[in-house]
Amino acid sequence: KDIKLQADLDSEKIIHEILTNAFSYPILSEESYKISDEEKKGIYWIVDPLDGSLNFSQNIPLCCISIALYENNKPLSGVIYDFNRDEMFSGIVGVGAWLNDKKIIPSDNIKDKSQAILATGFSSYMNYDKDGLMEFISNIQEFKKIRLLGSAALSLAYVACGRIDAYYEKDIAIWDVAAGIAILESLGNITYSFFQNELKCLIRVENKLKEKNDIRAN
């Protein structure tokens, strides 16, 4: 199961106060705040106050804060802040994406999967029986190298800026990936498939890879 820390709650409280003082939009957050389907038809925030809680608890510097703005289940903008490296990844759909104050320019380099680096993870919701594991392996085995960062948000940020070539994870919560999806959408030419069913999501992202394959929802 996901680890929950006092730091998650403290971060969430601060973010909630800042957002509610500045805006009237409802907030969907991992720890405490849920919204209705009707509210999701309008503009709303999706917040993960501390993505990579286990890393944080073990002093592994792969964790971040993730905040996204959505309207009718579609991304408008997103911010991922890596407080260990003081790196702010941000994106506005239709405008562009940035790493701190530098605009992210997607690479034109097209790679075969056999030469690409994939980030992935083992979700708390994932089916770990034989069939579930075989499906997982079938989706990652073509890649040259596999990395498990322990933070879905940072994994997507790294795809956006070209540090990693692709990301795949099944049965992951929307707040883990919402800001990353917004940043990818802001870049425009990164292919991703995203399917949402309540709190469980299936996401695959590829940055300039050959032989792209869509993953269809079951």
What kind of feature is each model-predicted range?
Residues P106-N218:
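An extended, acidic
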Residues D37-E39, S90, N109-K113:
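Solvent-exposed alpha-helices and their adjacent loops that cap or buttress functional pockets
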Residues D8, L19, S53, D82, ...:
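Residue-level signal for inorganic ion chemistry
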Residues L99-K103:
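A structural micro-motif at secondary-structure boundaries
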Residues K1-L50:
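N-terminal subdomain of lithium-sensitive/metallo-dependent phosphomonoesterases centered on the IMPase/IPPase/PAP
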Residues L9, E31, P49-G52, F83, ...:
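Generic detector of well-ordered alpha-helical packing
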Residues E39-W98:
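DPxDG-like acidic metal-binding loop motif
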Residues L76, I104-S107:
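Short, isolated positions in well-ordered beta-strands
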